[in-house]
Curated annotation (Swiss-Prot):
Gene3D superfamilies: N-(1-d-carboxylethyl)-l-norvaline Dehydrogenase, domain 2, NAD(P)-binding Rossmann-like Domain
UniProt: NAD(+) binding residues: 3-14
Gene: mtlD
Catalytic activity: D-mannitol 1-phosphate + NAD(+) = beta-D-fructose 6-phosphate + NADH + H(+)
Gene Ontology molecular function: any one: mannitol-1-phosphate 5-dehydrogenase activity
Leader peptide range in chain numbering: none
InterPro entries (alphabetical): 6-PGluconate_DH-like_C_sf (IPR008927), 6PGD_dom2 (IPR013328), Mannitol_1_phos_5_DH (IPR023028), Mannitol_DH (IPR000669), Mannitol_DH_C (IPR013118), Mannitol_DH_N (IPR013131), NAD(P)-bd_dom_sf (IPR036291)
Record organism: Pseudarthrobacter chlorophenolicus (strain ATCC 700700 / DSM 12829 / CIP 107037 / JCM 12360 / KCTC 9906 / NCIMB 13794 / A6) (Arthrobacter chlorophenolicus)
Stated name of the protein: Mannitol-1-phosphate 5-dehydrogenase
Length: 387
């Protein structure tokens, strides 16, 4: 069995690639990072260090690596003969990997089983996005690729922090992970991945993860940044920050229970498990890493505005989520392009215009005015400091 995985970074090596390896697949990593691909091509193995309640070290071997910029022909051949294609490249990069995936599918031989494609990204229905990009390629014109590939949405969860210098290809990750896959796409022919969970309805699990893990993690980062703390574990050790994060997850729990029918007890247990993960002192995760890309995190259907908007539509004032949104508006990091862009948006135009640009909310949405007030407050702070 063979899997082609796009994205040979820490998540690719320490999560998706590891599980595919453990399932018995030969893994072909594809990436545009020339130095990383060269390291992988020269290596026989690398180690994944799992830290937390059940520490362990796993060795990954039986892999190869290709530069997707300079070795496209070889990559097409690998896709044409693979069983699985996965990605961990970031949702905005899917459109760039779609062309070679389409060419690889087109090159598959007659009678081969459909290629099983899964985008493992921190985004809702990312595989649908990839499928649309593939379908838009010339190779797919006239339904030419119909029946040659199946696309299944997934929900993935594993904290992989910035790595210590000098680790090489080795990766440090938390011991917890979750890879939930939509079973219905495979029509009874699910791939053999023992570490994954297959479900008939994925949407509740995607939103549970996004509105608990991602919302909570980013909340800890932004509240921690406001408190002048460096690491996520330090932030969660601060009583005020921990209480703020807990209040945010109480609101998202309320939404998830009402919307998807999770029992209050089951969701509370999930929240408690997530909070324990955030306190893991063995993960050197920083508020700057987790807080980066604030514009994406503040966008319409993401981890803050998404649940806050739905609660507002249900007549609930999401006070804790609004507090997290306020903290996110105050996040600064000169090394992060989105943080710089956010500051630029806040510095120009009215509060209403900035709110619309940042959040994508319509002015008549019940959440809009509350967020616009927060934006106006942040604009006043910035104006005062620049005066």
């Amino acid at each position: 069995m063979k899997a082609v995985h796009f994205g040979a970074g820490n998540i690719g090596r320490g999560f998706v690639g590891l599980l595919l390896h453990n399932a018995g697949y030969e893994v072909v990593f594809a990436d545009v990072a020339e130095g990383l691909i060269a390291q992988l091509a020269d290596a026989d193995s690398y180690a994944v260090h799992e830290v937390g309640e059940s520490p362990a070290v796993q060795t990954v071997d039986n892999f190869r690596a290709l530069n997707s910029n300079t070795q496209e022909a070889e990559l097409i051949t690998e896709i044409a003969t693979a069983d699985i294609v996965t990605t961990a490249v970031g949702p905005h990069i899917l459109k760039f990997v779609a062309p070679v995936i389409a060419r690889g599918i087109a090159a598959r031989g007659a009678g081969m089983a459909p290629l099983q494609v899964m985008a493992c990204e921190n985004a809702i229905n990312a595989t649908d996005v990839l499928a649309r990009e593939v379908a838009s390629r010339p190779e797919a014109a006239g339904g030419a690729l119909d029946g040659q590939a199946v696309f299944a949405n997934t929900a993935v969860d594993r904290i992989v922090p910035n790595q210590e210098a000098g680790q090489g290809l080795d990766v440090t990750v938390e011991s917890f992970y979750e890879w939930v896959i939509d079973r219905t796409a495979f029509a009874g022919s699910e791939p053999e991945i023992p570490g994954a969970t297959f479900v008939d309805e994925l949407a509740p699990y995607i939103e549970r993860k996004l509105f608990t893990v991602n919302t909570g993690h980013a909340s800890a980062a932004y509240f921690g940044f406001e408190a002048g703390l460096e690491k996520i574990s330090d932030a969660m050790a601060d009583q005020d920050v921990a209480e703020d994060v807990r209040a945010v997850l109480e609101e998202t729990k309320q939404l998830l229970v009402a919307k998807h029918g999770f029992s209050n007890e089951a969701q509370e247990a999930y929240v408690q498990k997530i909070l324990v993960r955030f306190t893991n002192p063995h993960l050197p995760d920083t508020v700057n890493r987790v807080g980066r890309a604030p514009l994406r995190k503040l966008s319409r259907h993401e981890r803050f505005i998404g649940p806050a908007a739905e609660l507002a539509e249900r007549g609930v004032v999401p006070e804790a989520l609004l507090g997290a949104i306020s903290a996110a508006l105050r996040f600064t990091d000169p090394a992060d392009a989105e943080a710089t862009e956010l500051a630029g948006i806040l510095a120009s135009g009215s509060a209403a215009d900035a709110t619309a640009r940042i959040t994508g909310l319509d002015p008549d949405h019940p959440l809009f005015n509350a967020v616009s007030t927060l934006v106006e407050e942040r604009q006043a702070e910035l104006a005062a400091t620049s005066a």
